[in-house]
Amino acid sequence: MEEQVANAIEIASNPSADPALKTQAFDFVNQLRSDPSGWQVCLSLFTQTPQRSGIVRHVALEVVNSAAQGGLIDLQALAYVKDGLLAYLRQVYGQDAGASDPPNIQNKIAQTITFLFSALYASGWESFFDDLLGLTQKSPSSTTRDNASGIIFYLRVINSIHDEIGDVLVSRSRNEQDKANALKDLIRQRDMQKITSSWQQILSEWRDGNDVIVEMCLKAVGSWVSWIDIGLVVNQTMLDLLFRQLGRAQKEDLRQGEEKVRDAAVDVFTEIIGKKMKPEDKIDMIIFLNLDTIVSQLSNSPPLHGNRFTFKYDTDLAETVAKLVNITVIDIVRALEQEGVSTECKEKANGLLQAFLPHILRYFSDEYDEVCSTVIPCVSDLLTYLRRIAKVNPALASQHSSILLPILKAIIAKMRYDETSSWGEEDEQTDEAEFQELRKRLGILQQMIASINEQLYMEVVSEMVATTFENLRQSGSQMDWRDLDLALHEMFLFGDLAVKAGSLYTKGNPNNQAAERLIEMMLRMVESDIRSFTHPATQLQYTEICVRYSSFFHHHTHLIPGVLENFLQLVHHPIKKVKTRSWYLFQRLVKQLRQYVGNVAQTVVEALGDLLVIRAELPSEVSEGDEMSSEDHELADAIFNSQLYLFEAVGIICSTPTISPDKQVLYLQAVLNPIFLDMEKNLEAAKSQDERAILQIHHDIMALGTLARGFSDWMPGTNTPATLPAPEVSAAFNQVAEATLVALESLKSSFNVRTAARFAFSRLIGVLGSRILPQLPRWIDGLLTQTSSRDEMALFLRLLDQVIFGFKGEIFSILDTLLTPFLQRVFSGIADPTTGTDDEIQLAELKREYLNFLLAVLNNDLGAVIISERNQPIFETVISTIEHFSKDIDDFTTAKMAFSVLSKMSSSWGGPDVIAEASNGTPPSQAPLPGFGQFMITRFSPLCWALPSTPSFNSKDAQAKQVLAEAGGLQRTIYAKTGMEYLTYLRDRELPGMGMGGELIEEFVGALSRLDLKGFRQFFPVCLSNFHILSI
């Protein structure tokens, strides 16, 4: 059997084995894992002499592990496994044979031994640590820990045990944690003194002999210290051993692996300080350990001081020491801010804070960002503490300037790009992203300082920015771009203090002192020669700042032409990233300065002309045969989407009130005509399904719609101050609508063309107004086709709601004409079967938009169109769909809306209220529909009971209650319109037909006649719940 298992493992791991045979071998080994007796064969395979191959032994032990952890080995058998492995360990590790197992096997054995410890240490293997310690000596008579291979294995298990029961980062169930806590208690009672003594012996005897042993031992001390008696580690013997290892930091040249020992020794101190204890004890511990001196010595060591700013600088040690500084300062601050801490302790903590401030600054200002990031948490805690104090006593803010000033200066310095950075390079993107993330974190710290001492922050930043622009004035393009970028970045952040409600000004005056300072900075920046901004990073910063502080230009209008000229240079930038971002920012700027840019409209349109040429690119055209073609296509899409901002900017500029309508049309035609020609040129090819031509027309239509969006912010029914453009301009945009419709009618089978046309339609409403109404049938015919998705229908319905709301006085005849064919397409979309979750979501959305459309028609006094002679044939379908939706147990939102539509129909067509107290004082908006009262009673009323009669209906569900409230509202509306006729119907037919008893009927009818609309809406859900009618 053993040979069979060994052969199977060998075959399964052999890459050149026959695939069929290999599959059989895999299956055999996997069956072995679940076989209750499989572990016995594998244990024997692992411990055999002579040893099997490494892969056989590894897999064999893995099977044993799997069986043990999977519960296939009972306690008695676990003892057998323990005895077998212990005998193996004594044979291989206990005699310093010199040929111990490779690391992967050692780790696997350690894992097994750790599991056995968890299972048997409490009962069954009480001598666990004695047995393992026995491996650390070459013979029972040895008086020292002299067996290297045994020591390494012992420490490997020690560290594994911590991972199993002591590591707080490991997620455990409640039972697992309870077991871990019990095991820790047992260790502390039985063996802790013994274990810590072994660490001291190992560190003493192997201090210079074996770096691997010393490193592993230090890691064990550092990990276990968090849950053992601190006195077992913090004692003179152990500290002397630790200090000796720290001394390695003073060596100029370390042998390979020695730096790991040094760093592990520092980590021990970090773990000691990280141990939970009272603030008073922690402060005393920091003083006792003399951490200030330790950190000073480490900071002044050759790797961190002598080699700083050279390629030999030891960043690993710097980060390790920074962790020690960080955890120490966090505890110092905690002692300062916690209530109940003695005055004496706080005084000691204050002294420590002053002592550690140079250490904070040293590592916070480290040129390596990962080192700086390591101490950000303690800086954040410190500033949070100082901010809290300043709020309680603002006078203390100035006293803390000695702390805040150097931190602020360090923050600003760290925000500067370092000398090795190369902005914009493809292979630098990760570094750039990490640096920007660091800048964000530093920005938060800077905001905290501003909140503590605003005056200090303003003075430091203002001085830095002013000095930078003065240097720029003197040195021009010779200035290091990093310095200018830093100043601009600080200007951008300064707005957090200066800008209120999106502006630097309130009633024409600067918001505050910060706004005054920022206005001075803006003057310096804008009056600088942009040619001095030679680097793309600074050029982008310039545009971002101009947009963020556009309110500045409202009060310095003479500077606008120069700024626009600078922008027009940047929108032609050779670097794509700068160019496309500038397109967006240019649109933002002209939108915010619309009223001031009319005098340069012609110049701008001409300057942008070459950028308004649309070139659609298919993936194959971008990089044929390249695996990255999809990314290139996304890039091409992103570039076009950015280009649209230019079309919007042109629309904004051309629409300024200072330009006469004829000039507006002239500028518009300069942009529109090339697009019309392009559409005409590509239309025939697009009809032949040429993909590039179809995409080109999609882009053209999107550009036309975006131009319209820029031209007018007005939307029908909105309370915006904007108005429709002049008639001449609307006529020009009528050409846009016509060109779009021609393309749509020819290419309505294309989803992309429909999408672009729907967008254009939504924007053309704002520039055409009611002129668009006669075209509605053509828009509907093109946008709602046999291939249109439910999503498309829902989006268009939403647009129609807006049109109805905006033009309710003019749309009746057109709506009357198109309603039946339009709704037939919607019904078709609703009736189509769904094939997945996405389909179901789209169907639900379409149902809601259909109901919203009906509400829009009814709410805008257009309900007559639904019952007109032309649309009478579809009326029954409209009603039946609503009835169906009102009974949908799986979609309460739609059901609620369905009842709202039925209530609105009832109030619109049911005639005047016959119940005086039910009237809300507003007569029905439309003429009553003959016979509709009886229709409401017989068709609508039973629906109120349909949904709650469903077996799966839960009346306690919050959404269900809302549906019932809406159903109750419908019943009250029917009663208001029909009075006693409805009550009689309920008494004699509807309620008895449902099996309701006479007493309940009278109570229900009484409530209906007695309560007002609001009262009955509340009553109906409670009624159903209390009367248990749900089973009827």
UniProtKB/Swiss-Prot annotation:
Keyword presence, tRNA processing: yes
Main location: nucleus
Entry keyword annotation includes Transport: yes
GO molecular function, one term: small GTPase binding
Gene Ontology terms: cellular component: cytoplasm; nuclear matrix; nuclear pore
Family stated for the protein in its record: Belongs to the exportin family.
Function: tRNA nucleus export receptor which facilitates tRNA translocation across the nuclear pore complex. Involved in pre-tRNA splicing, probably by affecting the interaction of pre-tRNA with splicing endonuclease.
Identification of the protein by name: Exportin-T
Organism: Aspergillus fumigatus (strain CBS 144.89 / FGSC A1163 / CEA10)
Gene: los1
